[in-house]
Curated annotation (Swiss-Prot):
Function (record text): Plays a role in virus cell tropism, and may be required for efficient virus replication in macrophages.
Leader peptide range in chain numbering: 1-18
Organism, as annotated: African swine fever virus (isolate Pig/Kenya/KEN-50/1950)
Glycosylation-annotated residues: 100
Protein name: Protein MGF 110-6L
Free-text description of this protein's post-translational modifications in UniProt: N-glycosylated.
Length: 122
């Protein structure tokens, strides 16, 4: 009975706090290869990270939505980390982005380099 009560109390607390269900939790040391189950979260807010793409023969396929782009300066190596409620992107060269994990914000300084692949352009 106590277990059920604590479970319900925990569920109510997460709803009151408004924590997204897909929000990663815990600590994540800096990595260029985040856990597979967190890819959707990390790629939603900084889509040019190299770990979001599968690149071969000059084209890159997005691991989340399947979109295809030409490989260029848009796809960049980056590392991500998490401490408490701070999620951080490190794009090297002194470019960083920090956000509250529970209130994420999209950010992409390379968005102008994105070039969609079109089937007719062979």
């Amino acid at each position: 009975m106590l277990v059920i009560f604590l479970g319900i109390l925990g569920l109510m607390a997460s709803q009151v706090l408004g924590l997204p269900s897909n929000q990663p939790t815990g600590q994540l040391r800096p990595t260029e290869d985040p856990p597979e189950e967190e890819l959707e979260y990390w790629c939603a807010y900084m889509e040019s990270c190299q770990f979001c793409w599968d690149c071969q023969d000059g084209n890159c396929i997005n691991k989340i939505d399947g979109s295809v782009i030409y490989k260029n300066e848009f796809v960049r190596p980056c590392s991500v980390s998490r401490w408490m409620d701070k999620c951080m992107y490190d794009l090297n060269k002194g470019i960083y982005h920090t956000m509250n994990c529970s209130q994420p914000q999209s950010w992409n300084p390379y968005k102008y380099f994105r070039k969609e692949w079109k089937k007719d352009e062979l």
